[in-house]
Design a protein with these regions (language model features):
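Gly/Thr-rich phosphate-binding beta-strand-loop-beta motif of the actin/hexokinase/Hsp70
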Residues: 1-5, 93, 200
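Short glycine-rich, Thr/Ser-proximal phosphate-binding strand/loop in the N-terminal lobe
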Residues: 1-21
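Short, basic/hydrophobic alpha-helical segments
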Residues: 20-38
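Short glycine-rich phosphate-binding loop at a beta-alpha junction
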Residues: 37-46
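Short, well-ordered alpha-helical microsegments
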Residues: 49-53
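Long, charge-rich intrinsically disordered scaffolds of nucleic-acid metabolism proteins
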Residues: 55-59, 65-189
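Phosphate-backbone recognition surface of nucleic-acid-processing proteins
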Residues: 195, 200-246
Length: 246
């Protein structure tokens, strides 16, 4: 915790990211004579591991911001911070939120979070099914006992059945929500956007409050970068993979 600017007092506390995190944070803040409304929390977006904590902090009344890890490391280098430890990162992120004033994060609607969870589960199961099918192909091409082949075939079939079950749940969920159904229909009406891409685009676009196509492109990392200076620096344009500013 950073008090009174980057030159002010610093308080640190290690808190595990689990189901009791918000309760522990609130208890510690009470000892510091602070309330959620007094605190601006910033955390790096780390896959899906930040999502529950960010949502629970938001629901508890905190102002929450998410930082792009690449951007925060650039910020750290700009401050001359080369060391990377939890304590140093916490100080760097506190400075980041104080100086950059990142926008307030709002959690996606419950129907979007549920759709995202279904899609992630489908992707995991599909990957497992493909790996099991590759093993089956290998077993069929080698001297493998029949019991092993039967086991592999059953597992591949079970995984495919579960993929189909999840896909039915996804379709039913989209159909049950007028807003999701409308947006999904619009997305899949675009040439080259099929059902799977449409579902993933639906989650990305509805999970963030983009106000322009440029913002969405920056988030997805498809913004062209040109490197040209004078007569000596002329690199081929390429796509940015950095992602959003925050």
């Amino acid at each position: 915790m950073l008090y009174d600017g980057i030159k002010g007092r610093i308080k640190t506390r290690n808190i595990q990211n689990n189901r009791h995190s918000v309760e522990n944070i609130l208890r510690w803040l009470r000892l510091q004579h602070c309330s959620p409304e007094d605190v601006h929390v910033v955390m790096e977006a780390t896959g899906v591991y930040h999502e529950r904590l960010a949502t629970e902090l938001h629901d508890a009344g905190f102002r929450v911001s998410l930082a792009n890890p690449h951007r925060s490391r650039e910020f750290a280098r700009g401050m001359g911070i080369m060391t990377k430890t939890d304590k140093v990162d916490a100080y760097m992120l506190a400075c980041y939120v104080f100086l950059k004033k990142p926008h307030r994060w709002e959690p996606p609607a419950p129907e979007i979070r549920y759709l995202g969870a279904l899609l992630r589960r489908r992707d995991v199961l599909l990957g497992d099914a493909l790996r099991e099918e590759n093993r089956l192909e290998k077993y069929l091409s080698t001297d493998t006992p029949a019991d092993i082949i039967s086991s592999c075939r059953r597992m591949a079939q079970l995984l495919r059945e579960e993929v189909s079950n999840i896909e039915r749940q996804i379709k039913a969920h989209i159909k049950a929500s007028p807003a999701l159904r409308r947006d999904y229909t619009l997305l899949t009406s675009i040439k080259s956007v099929g059902p799977q891409l449409g579902m993933h685009m639906l989650v990305v676009l509805r999970s963030h409050n983009f106000v322009s196509a440029e913002q969405a492109a920056a988030f997805l990392g498809v913004v062209p970068i040109e490197k040209r200076s004078g007569t000596s620096v002329r690199s081929r344009p390429r796509m940015s993979k950095i992602g959003p500013l925050s």
